[in-house]
């Protein structure tokens, strides 16, 4: 399951012709919503991207996998995403302030997951 969402985001951005660095922030928004495990939060985030019914269904299935995987799965993948963030082209594309906001968001997700 590790990297599933990252792979999905990279495939989608490649398909749409976007630079992957431009898709970093939208990826973090979607990843955060999926990992939080709350369908309402996921719906709000997906609405920003005008997701189709099939796309919503796919993201809901990924969210179910994370929920089934439990706390350990969510924390491990959040840590992987953090490491990718601080060692990726995203870091060079966005300002330091934006990267700090993303890092803060990932830490907030971890705190929320841990209760």
UniProtKB/Swiss-Prot annotation:
Major site of localization recorded for this protein: secreted
Q: Which GO terms describe its cellular component?
A: extracellular space
Q: Does the keyword Lipoprotein feature in the UniProt annotation?
A: no
| PANTHER family documented for this protein | ABPBG26-RELATED (PTHR31708:SF0)
Source organism superkingdom: Eukaryota
Q: Which organism is it from?
A: Mesocricetus auratus (Golden hamster)
Which keywords has UniProt assigned to this entry?
Secreted, Signal
Where does the record locate the signal sequence feature?
Answer: 1-23
Protein biosynthesis is among the record's keywords: no
Q: What is this protein called?
A: Androgen-binding protein homolog
- Subcellular localization, as worded in the UniProt entry: Secreted
The record's Gene3D superfamilies line, in alphabetical order, gives:
1.20.920.50
Give the family this protein belongs to, as stated in its UniProt record.
Belongs to the secretoglobin family.
Q: What SUPFAM superfamilies is this protein classified in?
A: Uteroglobin-like
């Amino acid at each position: 399951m590790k990297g599933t969402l990252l792979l999905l985001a990279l495939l989608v951005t490649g398909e749409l012709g976007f630079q992957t660095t431009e898709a970093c922030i939208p990826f973090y928004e979607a990843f955060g919503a999926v990992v939080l495990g709350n369908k309402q939060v996921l719906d709000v985030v997906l609405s920003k991207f005008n997701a189709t019914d099939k796309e919503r269904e796919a993201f809901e299935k990924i969210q179910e996998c994370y929920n089934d995987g439990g706390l350990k799965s969510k924390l491990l993948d959040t840590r992987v995403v953090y490491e990718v963030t601080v060692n990726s082209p995203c870091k060079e594309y966005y300002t330091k302030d934006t990267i700090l906001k993303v890092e803060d968001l990932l830490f907030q997700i971890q705190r929320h997951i841990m209760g």
